[in-house]
Amino acid sequence: MAAMARNPNTRSRDMFLSMAVIVVPVLLLVWFFSSPGEEKPQRVDVAAQLKRATVEAPYPLLVAEGLGSEWVPVRAAWALEGQPWITGEPAEANSWQVGYLSPDEVYFGLQQRDGAEVAFVRSATREGHAVGGEVEAAGRSWERYESKDGRTRSLVSGGEADTAVVAADADFVALEAFAATLTEVAPQA
């Protein structure tokens, strides 16, 4: 029987076609599921929320000043007691919150409200406990707190009209430096 003539390039061509059938879908899956790059945090307009809050607030509001352009304001919210809060639930008290991302991308948050101090402090400090030591910043006395897992540190200031909590996953030195930038903005009459 005569041997059939074979094209010597057929085996190579078939191998390349088989590889393409396998590699192309894998590359498409990798491309589809890979992240498109780092997203920059969305800046929020703290001044707009602060303006509204100072008209409605029954207590002086704290806001950071002079942080520098590397700090990004990423949260600003105000709600009167009973109005929708950022959680979608009614605010339990007159509530002010502002948060910034540091140049190291650590979130530094300030929460301030009147009423229900114990539950508020427990929530804002991630169920933290006092660790001793007081700090003076923004014309207030602040007590140091640390969360149960030791990750989050907080400064708590209980005033006559309100309670304020500054919290971050940072050491107390950085937290106190942030608290030193806070200034009180009086409510408008």
Model-derived features with residue positions:
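Residue-identity detector for threonine
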Residues: T10, T54, T87, T125, ...
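A short, solvent-exposed beta-edge/loop patch
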Residues: V131-A189
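Generic hydrophobic secondary-structure signal
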Residues: M15-F32, L67, E89, V98-Y100, ...
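Short, solvent-exposed recognition patches
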Residues: V46-K148
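Charge-rich, low-complexity N-terminal segments
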Residues: M1-A79
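Generic surface-pattern signal
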Residues: F33, V55-Y59, R126, A180, ...
